[in-house]
C-alpha cells in the first residue's frame, strides 16, 4: 500500500464542530456509548496534525476511489490500549462547511477507534472511527468538553465531559476485533 501526502498543514480551531452530510445508509445504529465501545479497541483524545493521505483500495480497479486518512496525534487514551503517538484515521466524512476532512475542523476530538480493515483478518492499516460520525465528538468550550458530530444518531449523548461522563470499558483487543471483521 502506498500513502500519498496531501497539502494541508493547518490545524483546526477550538470550538469548531464539523458538519458531515450523511449520504449513505447505516449498517448499524449506535444508541449508547456502550454500543460504540463494543466495537472499539480504544477511545482517545486526539488532535489533527494537519496531514492527510490516501490509500488505494487493493481489491478495486484503477478507477476505485482511494480511502482518505487524516493523521492524528494522540493526546490521551481514555479507554482501551493504543501505544502509538500518531496514527492515521480513516476520515469519517468531509465537513460540508469546508469541503475538507471533518477531522481537520476542530482542534481536538474524542474518538472511538477500531482497526481499519477490509474484511476479517485483513487490516487496511491505521484506524477507523466506530460508526464514522457516530464515534466522533469534537472539542467545544473547555478542554474536557466534547460535542456530538453525528446528526443521525439522536440517542447518543449530545456531549461528553471527560471525568464526568462515564466511558464504558473496552472489552476487546485489536486482534479480537480484526478476527470478527468489520461492523
Name each region found by the language model:
Residues 11-68, 170, 174-183:
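Extracytoplasmic low-complexity, Pro/Thr/Ser/Ala/Gly-rich segments
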Residues 38, 64, 81-82, 102-105:
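Extracellular/periplasmic catalytic domains that process cell-envelope and extracellular macromolecules
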Residues 37-40, 52, 76, 113, ...:
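Sec/Tat-exported extracytoplasmic proteins
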Residues 58-91:
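OB-fold (S1/OB) nucleic-acid-binding surfaces
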Residues 2-5:
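C-terminal motif of bacterial Sec signal peptides marking the signal peptidase cleavage site
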Residues 43-47, 69-73, 88, 110-112:
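Soluble periplasmic/extracytoplasmic beta-strand elements of cell-envelope proteins
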Residues 48-50, 74-76, 91-93, 115, ...:
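A mature extracytoplasmic/lumenal domain signature
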Residues 7-15, 97-183:
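Netrin-like (NTR/C345C) domain of secreted extracellular proteins
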